[in-house]
Swiss-Prot record:
This is D-(-)-3-hydroxybutyrate oligomer hydrolase. Residues 1-33 form the signal peptide. It catalyses: (3R)-hydroxybutanoate dimer + H2O = 2 (R)-3-hydroxybutanoate + H(+). The active site is at 311 (charge relay system). GO terms for molecular function: hydroxybutyrate-dimer hydrolase activity.
Amino acid sequence: MTAIRGGSRRAPGLALALLGGVLLGACHGDENAQVNALPGFVSGSVRKTAYDGASDDLLTAGLGKTGLGSDTRPGFANPAQPSAAELRRLAIYSNYRALVDITPNGGYGRFWGPNVDLAGNDTLGEGKIAGTEYLAYSDDGSGRKNVTLLVQVPASFDPANPCIVTATASGSRGVYGAIAAAGEWGLKRGCAVAYNDKGGGNGAHEIGTGVVTLIDGTLATASSAGSSSLFTASESSSTLAAFNSAFPNRYAYKHAHSQQNPEQDWGRVTLQAVEFAYWALNEQFGPVVDGTRHGIRYRPGDITTIAASVSNGGGSALAAAEQDTRGWITAVVVGEPQINVRMTPGVTVEQGGAPVPSFGRPLADYATLANLLQPCAAAAVAATGAPYLSALPMGVTQSIRTQRCATLAAAGLVSGADTASQASDALAQLHAAGYLADSDLLQAPMWDSQAMPAIAVTYANAYTRSRVTDNLCNFSFATTNPVTGAVAAPAVSPMTNLFGAGNGVPPTNGINLVFNGASGGVDHRLATPDASFAGAFCLRQLWAANQLGIGTNVDAVRVAANLQHKPAIIVHGRSDALVPVNHASRAYVAQNSATEGRASQLSFYEVTNGQHFDAFLSVPGFDTRFVPVHYYDEQALNLMWNHLKSGAPLPPSQVIRTVPRGGVPGAAPALSTANLPPIVQSPGANAIAVNAGVIDVPL
């Protein structure tokens, strides 16, 4: 590991976290200087580490295709104090598996995986990729932003034909969050990959001990880390001590509790990741100008750069392309983007020639509504047979559904004299709010898995710039008793391996979402018979009544859907129940056509039987009904590459009508090309019509 000096801040012990370090000199400046100078936003040292492609590598951290596919996750020599290298290995393992179906029958090793080349053939063996990593913080000088930037340069990078692919983290994941979604394709293509964690980065602060994470996942106390922590709660030590006394075993999380509404900067930090990648490539391939320092070989626009990723990372790529004023980004390819669109009058989303009931709502709106209604809607007849995605006994879950329906009815929020009719009304309200009937079987697992409650709580905190001490709507993050769900001290602190195993949005890695009631904090599902309805209703009211500045902060994250005529592809699963296609991709495409008109180069591919979490596809009931959207994300990247490099036309917007695998839940037959029709140049009746602010998607 080589540490390249940047600004003045240093994380204690960071230079010792990886072995073999020496220091090189560098300075801040701009790309017009003769010397390749670090961008001014880079704070502290840049750490450069080479990987041989055998014992360790860029894509699999030395695990290879076999190791990533194994259910046995990599361990630590000393479980109480894992090394930075061990935490990196676990982070790559965990994040890779979190975004794709890792089962052979589901397509791993056949359609994707380290062994599969870009033509879809099994030719790459274990798929380890040698190369170099550059790691640093981006900050505004306060030491409180500390966005993690990471550039991977594969040994196959061709300086004469340079390319960059962005891989902004999805969700609130750490910096390796999109390694499977975009990083893998970029590395195989021989491109540098520009990662960033969006200012969330799985950063946590254990309030009771004061322990925080550093840039490489190793731990320090908040006082010793200072401004070099990934995240430290902003409250004074005395305030945190008082809070810990009243609410022990609690955790602050960066996305939820940084008070910075980080989403408003996701486009900007993605552009910074690209600029940092330019610096790294100039550092590695630029001419030596004074015997030690490198000059500039690549200037903005010189490198073919595809902004790519999925979910929040996909939204970040779109925002970056909109904000790009210097030519950093050449094209965009994103999957299931979580994007909040600033809709203008006259823009319309239609399906089958008829306007959809609702479109273009921001996440703060649809997520708080879904979190309120989903536990009840899950009991609707139309949701019968939904995959079960909860560790709770089915009887407990059924009771939650019945009680949530009853409480909603008592509050006048659903109608009906019995659970069945109340549940049908709850589901009808979700339909009226823009959720498609294609998502009916996913309403239950989105709530049962706690994906929707986690999103609702984290984003409500972020959009209201709340502190951990606020216990917004009486929710907080804590370790709990595995039997009762009551807040309890952990047997082993979850902080030890948080960087490697956490996802940045509790519940994760043993840190759970709890509701603070009269009897103390309890897992929100078990705190009251109706699964903490009061808290869910409070979250909904934040948006409905525009409380605590939520409207202003949501407006700050909205985008204009102006891609500045850059070629772009959006892929989205029609059945997505986490980021509904009406509110995200369809709305974005419609608004883009109003904004850019005929100059738009955006194609939209909507995948039937596609949903948000490919990692769920091995779960019984998911395997038989849904197909991998990731397969089409990779096809879209190939299409864009061919467009940029050989002028091949991008296929027009279309519905891709996939075929579910079928069979018995939990034992679906192997995925095959019969399930996955290609994206075509002439979609015929499957063409999506987009014109002058109106999108019409075939039924």
